[in-house]
């Protein structure tokens, strides 16, 4: 795809200065080192370095023009003869809309659904992709684990891709025949305008609990970032285009603001916002391998069987089906497909369950991505429902991240687990022992606890210690296959470590 510079500038409401050339643009690039001939260089403003200062190197490498911020132009001033456009504000504010226009506004050609919240985004997005595909609608998935569409799949580097590659991926998905798209939308992405230029047909608010307070100043700031998906990026019309979890305090606030532009959903039949939630569950029965019950929507009621474990997954299921019913898909067809959902890697993943049974004498081992206090609590409660004896929890906290949540996660583990093994997660530049000390501040003195900074040894210890009918929950990393130690990233997979520990174990009955 190609466009001309002047056309793109007008698309973001910028006047074209006199004498500026109007070259044909072959592609967009934010990295001066990866420029190819005919590319338009976009000088992205970074936390430490303003990429716009490298405009001259981009031109040398073949860029037909560069767009930079005023700040970058002061650090490395261009002349009037240079093919450089100077923006009054950071380039990131314009990048999403510019990229969307360059790629022909691909999101407007599909039903794009955004999912935001602290926990539940990945499972909900996987559900949406699976259900729409099962009903014969080719779908795309953009999120924490993978980006994929028909005949293409790649491992994700970010929960939400940056604006320029995101629009390119959307165009490729449209070219592959996609009708629906499920996109995880992080608070970082919303704060950094990565989804500017995306037209969302629908949006889901899963929940909000403590996370990323190293980036956001407060829970209020964190909420404002999440809420911007519903205020600024949804297609604006009179009908409801969102589904909001009102069992969550912040969700209730958002639902009251959106009013009739949203459907409320709750695991309770009564609502403080409306007489009844728009989406809710009744006649719930817990089974060994999931749940069954009735799902209520404004468009009808249907019986469901869900293979997902944990009450929090009932909310994920309710929201995924709710948004698709809201967008016009038939409820009964969605509920029929639900029973075949294969689950999500690293999300309440049962490592050694075979035909709903665990080898005699062995514990059940579960790997989950839970890395926030709320997420850990949900995973522990779900794991408790599967154990007949002790619940053992292995977890740590990431380094160079929100330190305030560490003691809270220790407090949660002490409250809901019978035995705790505190270990490392991704310590990054911090000392693992110091992180563990922060976690221990929230753990009561009478708790049964072991400390082992080496994560592989901690997993092996917990599984060796567990007995028949115990459950071992390994929390924090889920699908991740790496560990970050100082400046080194090593291969590490909790699921592989768990299987190895199980194979080394002698029967303890």
UniProtKB/Swiss-Prot annotation:
One of its GO terms (cellular component) is cytoplasm. InterPro entries: Mur-like_cat_sf, Mur_ligase_C, Mur_ligase_C_dom_sf, Mur_ligase_cen, Mur_ligase_N, MurE/MurF_N, UDP-N-AcMur-Glu-dNH2Pim_ligase. Transmembrane segments: none annotated. Pathway: Cell wall biogenesis; peptidoglycan biosynthesis. It comes from the Bacteria. The modification N6-carboxylysine is found at residue 226. Its cofactor is Mg(2+). It holds the Pfam family Mur_ligase_C. It is found in: Cytoplasm. ATP binds at residues 117-123. This is UDP-N-acetylmuramoyl-L-alanyl-D-glutamate--2,6-diaminopimelate ligase. Catalyzes the addition of meso-diaminopimelic acid to the nucleotide precursor UDP-N-acetylmuramoyl-L-alanyl-D-glutamate (UMAG) in the biosynthesis of bacterial cell-wall peptidoglycan. Meso-2,6-diaminopimelate binds at residues 401, 425-428, 476, 480. A motif (Meso-diaminopimelate recognition motif) lies at residues 425-428. The lineage of its organism: Bacteria, Bacillati, Cyanobacteriota, Cyanophyceae, Synechococcales. Gene3D superfamilies: Mur ligase, C-terminal domain, Mur-like, catalytic domain, MurE/MurF, N-terminal domain. Its EC number is 6.3.2.13. Keywords: ATP-binding, Cell cycle, Cell division, Cell shape, Cell wall biogenesis/degradation, Cytoplasm, Ligase, Magnesium, Nucleotide-binding, Peptidoglycan synthesis. Its main location: cytoplasm. Signal peptide: none annotated. It catalyses: UDP-N-acetyl-alpha-D-muramoyl-L-alanyl-D-glutamate + meso-2,6-diaminopimelate + ATP = UDP-N-acetyl-alpha-D-muramoyl-L-alanyl-gamma-D-glutamyl-meso-2,6-diaminopimelate + ADP + phosphate + H(+). Carboxylation is probably crucial for Mg(2+) binding and, consequently, for the gamma-phosphate positioning of ATP. One of its GO terms (molecular function) is ATP binding. The gene is murE. UDP-N-acetyl-alpha-D-muramoyl-L-alanyl-D-glutamate binds at residues 32, 159-160, 186, 192, 194. One of its GO terms (biological process) is regulation of cell shape. It is an enzyme of class 6 (ligase).
